[in-house]
């Protein structure tokens, strides 16, 4: 009977995995057009909805919306969505415009604009504090780290999570630095504050007068309250979605809080990769747009808001990430006059670091090669993980319920003297397992700090990836409860 109870959960897991492997899949094996790719993969990847725009040969070749937002309202290509960390490319464009107009210099200490920041001590990753003022170039290039705890005025309630690099090795190297993380989400908020100080105008007014109005981006703004019908963001939980009704704070605009649409971003990206002859915006002529995606340092990986990765295949220029309820991925190919942008009403580490990059990669294959292979069906894997997790929880609940019989049987071994060593090993294993589970739960925010470069609360851990975070946390806690109940029963039985 005990053996049967032991193998039943594993049999259920095997059945679920086999069903997932052999059930018919959706869509063709290969995609040859953008519409079938994004229509099918939205379902296969478990994404609530997204807007897509693609620039090819300097023209807007594709612009469509699929799915729905957190409240299941259908998305359209003109539905406003939060841009998240990709807001940096618009702030970077403003900075470039100010530099071109000689209103500001990149190598000037930021304390010249905001004296309160004069005491800010910056340092390179793994190095001691730099004995020099922090400059605007260093800030815009994410060149140095600085103590975020000393900047409460620039740290709103909602913080974005910048997407990782396309190469796994580069992703790990950039997200697990030797000491301090340089890509602070506060960097471009400070840049935005400096632009306001220099111009004596609000950031939202600068964005409108210098970028959005000249380019006809009428639904792009740093003042979300000025736009109606912004899509409600969503979170994900094992392939299912739930709505977020909480809005992103206004003061996050310069780095995380700009609202836009795929239609508007298509206009902006078209200007960036292939502006029409003579097409200018204040401080940025059509011939100057390549400045936007040139590294601010020769050995750097960041331009005016853009991230730049050099590889054997050439430069990979991108930006994106997640903020509560929303994610985005933007990639440009300036040498080919092409660009891809995906905006989605759903957040999470998985969607911003894996799913959206995968979809961009597939679209890139169609764009340049005419065909793309069908990617891995993530939603199916998430549903399998959800069922396995449920079975695991049920097994742990049963083990907690049967703690008395477990302790009684263990003490019988000891009383009969048949296996004293076995009893001791079981008790030691139970205690160590309990301590390890508690330690992992307590240290989870510390591990997240190493990953994202800033202190992370338990609430944020669950918000950025509800399925995985809640699964791991619940599994650890239920395992700890099981061990506690077993140890308590052993103590009670020994006393009686």
Question: How should each PLM-predicted stretch be described?
Answer:
Residues 30, 34-37, 50, 86-87, ...:
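Stable alpha-helical elements in mature extracytoplasmic
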